[in-house]
Structure formats: structure tokens, C-alpha cells
A protein has these predicted regions:
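C-terminal accessory/connector segments of nucleic-acid motor ATPases
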Residues: 1-25, 33-34, 207, 227
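Basic, low-complexity terminal or inter-domain segments flanking catalytic cores
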Residues: 19-20, 24, 41-320
Length: 320
């Protein structure tokens, strides 16, 4: 199911919405009582919500025209895990959707409802199963291998494909190779080969989709396993961080890409690594967890921050 960050990422990929636009839309739908609380970092629901989830799935199929022909036998257990729900469960449509004329909503809100509805149906739908075949070929002492897939049961993929077919910009799926029927020991005649030349390409510029993913996982290897908050920012603040960079002139949008400006590049060059590395964020979060457990002193932590700030101001006076 969707937490806020994953919803923001997919809304950017499918619709081109910025993280802030998605946050504003889900907040509006929450205030209209059509979506549950949006600022969540959980992708699961609790076991006491099973009946409600079944009811919501039926409502989604009745109320959202895109899914009117969908018939599902939901497996709610796949999205139920009490241990993975903290303050708030995953984002879901609410039972109030039953009373809503969806066609009267703005197109942008309808798109978010379709996205959240699709995720719920896919997450609880029938399993997608396929048979994978691997062929090994021997030629002139060299061994060549290839793989192909044959779909046995499309399952939840059919719902995802239905959703993607409604998009103006079609998503490209990875098409598995269809292999011819062969048997062990077959000899293939008339096989040809050719050489093609390819060049490495530089990494792609960040989109809000990929930047949100990077923020979510930044410095994770530096955090203790049981630290509650990891990465840069929280689901509720990451959109604001991106918008602040754009409004401050340190980044700009070009199509779906986020590009650092000259001022942004210069800022990163002059800032000390201590500030630009996610390691400091990890250290602070780890210490805050220790304070919560009574294993570290809050006053000493604050004094350390004050001391570090003073040292940085002295070492880099031009930044103040």
C-alpha cells in the first residue's frame, strides 16, 4: 500500500505532479474525508481493519469508473502487519467515497483517487504468476544463456495494466522475451551473430520520484537498526525541502527533472562536508534515540550542537 513518499513518487512518475502538489492534493482529499491520514510512513494496515478494507475495496470498484469492471477476491492478509504500523496506517480511500460524486471532483483529485485505488486493488489482488525458462546453448566451445517468461496467471498485473492504459503518457513495461519451443539436445542451424557497439551513459538527472527515493534512503547504513527516523527529512517534510531549494534558487525544474543551479553548485562546493553529509543527520537521530531511552544526556547533546555551530561560524565566516 502507499505511504506518503511512495505515493508522491508514483504521482510524479505517472502524472508529473511535484511532491508538494501531491501532498496538497492528498491533504484536500483527507479534509473531504475521501482519503485517510496522508502523512504516514507505513505501507500496511492493522488486523482490526480487515473488514473495513474489504468494504473500501468494494466501494472503489463501484465508485471509480476506471475499475468498474474489476472483480477481485481480496487477500487482506498480504497488507496486514501490526508491527509495521507506527502512528498511522497506509493511505487508503475511506468508506465516505461511497457518497461522493467522483466526476464532480477536480481531475487532479480524481487522478490521486485512481492511483490510491489501483494500489489497494493490486496489493490485495490475485498473485501474478509466471513460468520462467532458461535455455543454455553451446557453440564453438562457448556457452550462451537466455531467459524467457510465460505468464501463467496475470493476477494483479491486469489491474495495473488497466490503470496504465488510461494514462496519456504510456508507461513502458519490461517485456520478457518469448522463447521458441526447444528440447534438450536440439541442434540449431543457420544461426547468425553480429557485434554492436555501445557507450556508457552518465547518470540521469534526478526527478522528484528518484530524489524522494534518494532522500528516503540517504545515509541508512549510518543509522542504528532500530532508529525510528531514517533518511533526509520525513514523509511530511520532504516536499517542503524540495520546494525550498527551488524557491531559494538552488535548484530548478526542467520538465520532470530537478537541476541544481549555479548558486546551488557553488553552495555545495563551499559548505563543509560535515554539513552536506547525511552522516550528521544519522548521528543526531541515533543520539536522540539514546536520549529517549535514558542512555544519553539531552543537555550534553544540545551543548555539542551549540559548540559545533560556533566552530563552523568561526571556520567559515563568509557563510554567515
Amino acid at each position: 500500500l502507499y505511504d506518503l513518499t511512495t505515493l508522491q513518487r508514483e504521482a510524479n512518475r505517472y502524472y508529473g505532479f511535484t511532491a508538494q502538489q501531491t501532498l496538497d492534493l492528498v491533504q484536500t482529499l483527507y479534509e473531504k474525508k475521501l482519503l485517510t491520514y496522508p502523512r504516514t510512513d507505513s505501507q500496511f494496515i492493522t488486523d482490526d481493519m480487515e473488514d473495513t478494507a474489504r468494504q473500501v475495496i468494494s466501494i472503489v470498484c463501484r465508485q471509480l469508473p476506471l475499475f468498474s469492471d474489476v472483480s477481485v477476491t481480496p487477500d487482506i492478509a498480504r497488507v496486514t502487519d501490526n508491527s509495521k504500523v507506527t502512528d498511522h496506517h497506509a493511505i487508503l480511500p475511506t468508506v465516505q467515497l461511497e457518497k461522493q460524486d467522483v466526476s464532480a471532483l477536480p481531475q487532479s483529485e480524481q487522478k490521486i483517487l485512481n492511483l490510491v485505488g489501483m494500489r489497494l486493488l493490486c496489493a490485495t489482488g490475485e498473485k501474478h504468476t509466471y513460468a520462467e525458462t532458461q535455455i543454455s546453448l553451446s557453440c564453438e566451445g562457448y556457452e550462451f544463456k537466455t531467459k524467457g517468461k510465460t505468464v501463467v496467471q496475470n493476477g494483479w498485473k491486469s489491474i495495473e495494466e488497466l490503470f496504465k492504459s488510461s494514462l496519456k503518457t504510456k508507461e513502458k513495461d519490461d517485456l520478457a522475451k518469448t522463447l521458441p519451443e526447444v528440447h534438450e539436445g536440439d541442434v540449431l542451424d543457420g544461426v547468425s551473430a553480429s557485434v554492436t557497439e555501445h557507450f556508457t551513459t552518465p547518470p540521469k538527472q534526478y526527478t522528484e520520484d528518484t530524489l524522494l527515493s534518494a532522500m528516503e534512503t540517504a545515509g541508512n547504513d549510518q543509522f542504528d537498526d532500530d532508529t525510528e527516523k531514517k533518511g533526509l527529512g520525513t514523509p511530511a517534510t520532504r516536499a517542503g525541502i524540495i520546494e525550498k531549494l527551488v524557491k531559494s534558487g538552488f535548484a530548478e525544474r526542467k520538465g520532470k527533472s530537478l537541476i541544481p543551479t549555479k548558486d546551488g553548485c557553488n553552495l555545495v562546493c563551499v559548505l563543509p562536508e560535515q554539513i552536506t553529509s547525511p552522516k550528521m543527520t544519522a548521528e543526531w537521530e541515533n543520539t536522540l534515540m539514546e536520549i529517549e531511552r535514558g542512555k544519553a544526556d539531552a543537555d550534553a547533546f544540545l551543548s555539542g550542537i551549540v559548540r559545533m555551530t560556533g566552530d563552523l561560524v568561526k571556520a567559515y565566516p563568509f557563510l554567515s
